[in-house]
Amino acid sequence: WIMGHMVDDIAMVDDFLDNGANGLELDISFDSNGKAEYTYHGTPCDCFRSCTRYESFDKYMEYVREISTPGNQKFRKSLIMLIMYLKLNSLYANQLYTAGSDIADQLARHYWKDDGAARAYMVLSLPSITQTEFIRGFKNRMESQGLQKYYAKIGWDFTGNEDLDDIEATYKKLNITEHIWQSDGITNCLNRGTDRLEDAIRRRDKPGNKYINKVYLWSIDKMSSIRDALDKGVDGIMVNYADRFIDVLKESKYSSKYRLATYEDNPWETFRP
């Protein structure tokens, strides 16, 4: 999975897809009432990137609905996943619950409004395990509005590099045992060790594991780092330059072992060689 990083305006959506991404990460900012407002990262952000490009959340979702709907004249079959990084750190518990409810409402209004014709999978990525009120708000609204069928398209991720045992315990409390991506990473401006990443991969591959289906690394720019991550066995990498990942996949060492995921590949299923 090639996940374009910080794809926060519509022009970048097309640029990343043109360069080979099959997944897009967008940063969702909220107002003081817990309502999703913009796709916007802000400063600081990754080195050599503009931190301030943005779009209104509703307009962004309308656009990705069009390009991920078969039969639409704008359809792009390569777009199969959206990774929604939820900028929740400034919200209190009651606002977190509202934010979860609002995301469910806005997805129903702007993305699934054609009775689910738009086909992208979505990973809801939370900064911390302390923000589970968002998940409760999201699930309660989905169920009260009869939107449970869309759970098949929803996955989960905690992206704050927290202890993996604590993350597992959180999923147990939430009764979430599937559709789990586990991230590990840091801004491309800094180096990070790989111990936690390797531990996540071991847990993913452990027989009987219920709490990690896929593992991805963020955010990587160097081709040598992409190779190293593939050698370790990640399922996806979040990148600023998707074409570099494509070039690595063309190398003989990797072309015989890896291929770009397609819509027919289940993003919630652990790959077993």
From Swiss-Prot:
<keyword id="KW-0479">Metal-binding</keyword>
<comment type="function">
    <text>Dermonecrotic toxins cleave the phosphodiester linkage between the phosphate and headgroup of certain phospholipids (sphingolipid and lysolipid substrates), forming an alcohol (often choline) and a cyclic phosphate. This toxin acts on sphingomyelin (SM). It may also act on ceramide phosphoethanolamine (CPE), lysophosphatidylcholine (LPC) and lysophosphatidylethanolamine (LPE), but not on lysophosphatidylserine (LPS), and lysophosphatidylglycerol (LPG). It acts by transphosphatidylation, releasing exclusively cyclic phosphate products as second products.</text>
</comment>
<dbReference type="GO" id="GO:0046872">
    <property type="term" value="F:metal ion binding"/>
</dbReference>
<feature type="active site">
    <location>
        <position position="5"/>
    </location>
</feature>
<keyword id="KW-0443">Lipid metabolism</keyword>
<feature type="active site" description="Nucleophile">
    <location>
        <position position="41"/>
    </location>
</feature>
<feature type="disulfide bond">
    <location>
        <begin position="45"/>
        <end position="51"/>
    </location>
</feature>
<keyword id="KW-0964">Secreted</keyword>
<feature type="binding site">
    <location>
        <position position="25"/>
    </location>
    <ligand>
        <name>Mg(2+)</name>
    </ligand>
</feature>
<keyword id="KW-0442">Lipid degradation</keyword>
<keyword id="KW-1061">Dermonecrotic toxin</keyword>
<keyword id="KW-0204">Cytolysis</keyword>
<protein>
    <recommendedName>
        <fullName>Dermonecrotic toxin SdSicTox-betaIF1</fullName>
        <ecNumber>4.6.1.-</ecNumber>
    </recommendedName>
</protein>
<dbReference type="GO" id="GO:0090729">
    <property type="term" value="F:toxin activity"/>
</dbReference>
<keyword id="KW-0456">Lyase</keyword>
<dbReference type="GO" id="GO:0031640">
    <property type="term" value="P:killing of cells of another organism"/>
</dbReference>
<keyword id="KW-1015">Disulfide bond</keyword>
<dbReference type="GO" id="GO:0016829">
    <property type="term" value="F:lyase activity"/>
</dbReference>
<keyword id="KW-0354">Hemolysis</keyword>
<dbReference type="InterPro" id="IPR017946">
    <property type="entry name" value="PLC-like_Pdiesterase_TIM-brl"/>
</dbReference>
<keyword id="KW-0800">Toxin</keyword>
<keyword id="KW-0460">Magnesium</keyword>
<feature type="binding site">
    <location>
        <position position="27"/>
    </location>
    <ligand>
        <name>Mg(2+)</name>
    </ligand>
</feature>
<comment type="similarity">
    <text>Belongs to the arthropod phospholipase D family. Class II subfamily.</text>
</comment>
<feature type="disulfide bond">
    <location>
        <begin position="47"/>
        <end position="189"/>
    </location>
</feature>
<dbReference type="GO" id="GO:0016042">
    <property type="term" value="P:lipid catabolic process"/>
</dbReference>
<dbReference type="GO" id="GO:0008081">
    <property type="term" value="F:phosphoric diester hydrolase activity"/>
</dbReference>
<dbReference type="GO" id="GO:0005576">
    <property type="term" value="C:extracellular region"/>
</dbReference>
